[in-house]
C-alpha cells in the first residue's frame, strides 16, 4: 500500500492517475479483502492481537524516550510532538479495541444457553 501511495505522489501534474501501474493496484486490492489475508498466511487472531499489543507498547515507549530526548534538548519540538501524537493515536486505538472486546463479551454472557 505504501508503494502505491508513493507511486501516486510521484505522478506529475501532466500525467493522469491511470498511469499508476496495475500491479500495485491489484496487490493493494487483494490485501484489503477481509477474509483472505489471515486465511492465506495461517495467522491466528491471538497472534494478530499480540503483535498489535506489542506494537502499541513499543509506540508508547518510543514516545516516552522521545519526550526525555526533548527534555535533554537532543530532539526537536516537532519530533517530540509527532511521537506523542502517534502514541496518542495508538492508545486511542487500543482503547477502542478494548471497548469492542468488552461489549462482545457482554453480548456473549447475555446469550441464553
UniProtKB/Swiss-Prot annotation:
Localization of this protein: Bacterial flagellum basal body
KW Ligase (keyword) present: no
Keyword flag Lipid metabolism: no
InterPro entries according to UniProt: FliE (IPR001624)
A GO BP annotation: bacterial-type flagellum-dependent cell motility
Entry keyword set: Bacterial flagellum
Molecular-function annotations in GO: cytoskeletal motor activity; structural molecule activity
GO cellular component assignments: bacterial-type flagellum basal body
Top-level taxonomic group: Bacteria
Family under the similarity heading: Belongs to the FliE family.
Database matches in HAMAP family: FliE
This protein's name: Flagellar hook-basal body complex protein FliE
Annotated source species: Rhizobium etli (strain CIAT 652)
GN (gene name): fliE
Amino acid at each position: 500500500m505504501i508503494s502505491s501511495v508513493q507511486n501516486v505522489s510521484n505522478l506529475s501534474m501532466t500525467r493522469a492517475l491511470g498511469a499508476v501501474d496495475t500491479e500495485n493496484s491489484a496487490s493493494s486490492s487483494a490485501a484489503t479483502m477481509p477474509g483472505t489475508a489471515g486465511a492465506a498466511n495461517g495467522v491466528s487472531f491471538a497472534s494478530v492481537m499480540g503483535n498489535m499489543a506489542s506494537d502499541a507498547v513499543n509506540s508508547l515507549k518510543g514516545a516516552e524516550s522521545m519526550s526525555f530526548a526533548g527534555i535533554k534538548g537532543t530532539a526537536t519540538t516537532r519530533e517530540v510532538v509527532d511521537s506523542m501524537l502517534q502514541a496518542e493515536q495508538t492508545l486511542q486505538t487500543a482503547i477502542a479495541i478494548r471497548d469492542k472486546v468488552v461489549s462482545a463479551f457482554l453480548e456473549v454472557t447475555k446469550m441464553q444457553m
